[in-house]
Design a protein with these regions (language model features):
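Bacterial N-terminal signal peptides that target proteins for export
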Residues: 1-10
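Cleavable N-terminal signal peptides
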Residues: 11-13, 23-24
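N-terminal signal peptide c-region/cleavage motif recognized by signal peptidases
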Residues: 18-20
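N-terminal leader/targeting pre-sequences
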Residues: 24-209
């Protein structure tokens, strides 16, 4: 199958949700990111995401390994705007039986794309060229400090509900090389190549013990 060309990130749809300061279930959270689609893409992406809330700031640190090297990887937390518990998809999320769990197939259990992990999360812009890129060894690091109020205000404008509820969200890492051939059955957002949004790792956000 001939790989589809990478289109502008301006074509990606954006969604987001976050919560009032002081209403967090905890002040430190962690997500252990485990591989998705590893058997198909030939690499097992994994890592750890740590999120902490202090002095009105949300600090996010993500360390990853096993990524397809040399490319930028979209990273976000996903969830349900109504506060329903999100979960990482299992193999049975592959409802069309093509061997891949694509972005659209994750929505039933994981919800929609919410907060992006790039240089400016409070913009809520999913299309962005400042997501982390993997080095030659397949490792990537992300760190960001953002005012909770800035994220809340943006999310309230977009979703009419500044609900963070980190413990009800999951984190996804996306993306494989555009040289990787995918069947047409692997679905993505309108106008966005499937290799950009294919989930390659996921972890549930939990209060750190």
């Amino acid at each position: 199958m001939t790989p589809r060309p990478l289109l502008s990130f301006a074509a990606v749809a954006a969604f987001a949700v976050v919560a009032p300061a002081g209403s967090f279930a905890a002040d430190k959270f962690v997500a252990k990111l485990q591989p998705l689609n590893a058997a198909k893409i030939g690499t097992a992406a994994k890592g750890t995401a740590k999120l902490s809330v202090a002095d009105g700031k949300l600090v996010t640190v993500i360390d990853l390994e096993g990524l397809p090297p040399g490319i930028m990887h979209l990273q976000h937390y996903h969830g349900f705007p109504d506060g329903k518990q999100a979960a990482c998809p299992a193999a049975d999320a592959d409802t069309n039986g093509d061997g891949y769990v694509d972005l659209i197939e994750t929505e039933a259990v994981a919800g929609t794309t919410m907060v992006p992990f790039h240089a400016h999360p409070a913009t809520l812009e999913i299309p962005n060229d400042t997501y982390p890129s993997a080095d030659k060894s397949g490792a990537a690091h992300y760190t960001n400090t953002e005012a909770v109020a800035d994220i809340e205000n943006a999310l309230k404008d977009k979703f009419k509900s500044p609900l963070l509820a980190l413990e009800k969200r999951v984190i996804f890492v996306h993306g494989i090389s555009e040289k990787s051939a995918l069947p047409d059955s692997v679905k993505s957002l309108p106008g966005v190549p499937a290799h950009v949004t294919l989930p390659i790792a996921c972890g549930t956000i939990e209060a750190e013990k």
